[in-house]
Curated annotation (Swiss-Prot):
Signal peptide: none
Protein name in the entry: Ubiquinol-cytochrome c reductase complex assembly factor 5
Subcellular location: Mitochondrion inner membrane; Mitochondrion
Sequence ranges on the Mitochondrial matrix membrane side: 1-20
Keywords: Membrane, Mitochondrion, Mitochondrion inner membrane, Transmembrane, Transmembrane helix
Domain of life: Eukaryota
Membrane-spanning parts: 21-43
Tissue: Expressed in the brain.
Gene Ontology molecular function: protein-containing complex binding
Family indicated by similarity: Belongs to the UQCC5 family.
Naturally occurring in which organism (per UniProt): Drosophila melanogaster (Fruit fly)
Function: Required for the assembly and stability of the mitochondrial ubiquinol-cytochrome c reductase complex (complex III (CIII) or cytochrome b-c1 complex), a multisubunit transmembrane complex that is part of the mitochondrial electron transport chain (ETC) which drives oxidative phosphorylation.
Phylogenetic classification of the source organism: Eukaryota, Metazoa, Ecdysozoa, Arthropoda, Hexapoda
Residue numbers on the Mitochondrial intermembrane membrane side: 44-79
Gene Ontology biological process terms from the UniProt entry: mitochondrial respiratory chain complex III assembly
Length: 79
């Protein structure tokens, strides 16, 4: 065991709601951490790129490819 296991256990046991909610008492913490991660991925820019711009670019590329595929398929069906 690591030397931190005792302090981690004390911290987890001191988190309120253990009797009523059990392990589900940590859900608000995970929601907040997830929201913070999402916020940072959208708003923080590394160099010239951030996650949001990259995602939108990939989404637009996939949409264009799908439309081209559908148009090619329609052209083949009419021949």
């Amino acid at each position: 065991m690591s030397p931190y296991s005792g302090s981690v256990r004390r911290l987890l046991d001191s988190w309120p709601g253990k009797k009523r909610f059990g392990v589900y008492r940590f859900l608000p913490l995970f929601f907040l951490l997830g929201a913070g991660l999402e916020f940072s991925m959208i708003n923080w820019t590394v160099g010239e790129t951030n996650f949001y711009r990259t995602f939108k670019r990939r989404q637009a590329k996939n949409y264009v490819e799908e439309q081209q595929h559908l148009q090619a398929r329609a052209a083949n069906n009419t021949n």
